[in-house]
Swiss-Prot record:
The keyword Calcium applies. This is Translationally-controlled tumor protein. Keywords: Calcium, Cytoplasm, Phosphoprotein. Pfam families: TCTP (PF00838). The gene is TPT1. GO terms for molecular function: calcium ion binding; DNA-binding transcription factor binding; RNA binding. Homodimer. Interacts with STEAP3. Interacts with TSC22D1; interaction results in the destabilization of TSC22D1 protein. Residues 70-172 are annotated as: Required for reduction of TSC22D1 protein stability. InterPro entries: Mss4-like_sf, Mss4/transl-control_tumour, TCTP, Translation_control_tumour_CS, Translational_control_tumour_p.
């Protein structure tokens, strides 16, 4: 399995269990997710071992809640954040500088294509700004990557967009 981590915060962003495709001439990765519901707080009797107690009513004392969300967000503990268009412009400008610096150190051949492609992609993001929800890694590092969540035309299928050059891959 491959884990994709944020190059700056080192937070886990997603893994290769999802359908991943390159978009924007290889500048970004689009990761398709699913809406899922999970029950939290419910303890399965098979995990406890032994027999269920005969002393009290069945299920007493266990409260469970059902949480519904996008599997990528829930599995990798991504945290939702919000931006005004102006705040996002400021963030993305600083983020691009950070990634450019990392690329200059590690992969100088990627600097020019990244900077050229990023400008186009940012125009596209800003043009569709109201469609997106924004997510950052578990540690909520404000300098790290902000992933974008949108839904396909069907209104049901969620997908997330990540800048490919802002990710590092870790084989597990």
């Amino acid at each position: 399995m491959i884990i994709y981590r944020d190059l700056i915060s080192h937070d886990e962003m997603f893994s290769d269990i999802y359908k991943i495709r390159e978009i924007a001439d290889g500048l970004c990765l689009e990761v398709e997710g699913k809406m899922v519901s999970r029950t939290e707080g419910n303890i399965d009797d098979s995990l406890i071992g032994g027999n269920a107690s005969a002393e009290g009513p069945e299920g007493e004392g266990t409260e469970s809640t059902v949480i519904t969300g996008v599997d990528i967000v829930m599995n990798h503990h991504l945290q939702e954040t919000s931006f005004t268009k102006e705040a996002y412009k400021k963030y993305i400008k600083d983020y691009m500088k950070s990634i450019k610096g990392k690329l200059e150190e590690q992969r100088p051949e990627r600097v020019k294509p990244f900077m050229t492609g990023a400008a186009e992609q940012i125009k596209h993001i800003l043009a569709n700004f109201k469609n997106y929800q924004f997510f950052i890694g578990e540690n909520m590092n404000p300098d790290g990557m902000v992933a974008l969540l949108d839904y396909r035309e069907d209104g049901v299928t969620p997908y997330m967009i990540f800048f490919k050059d802002g990710l590092e891959m870790e084989k597990c």
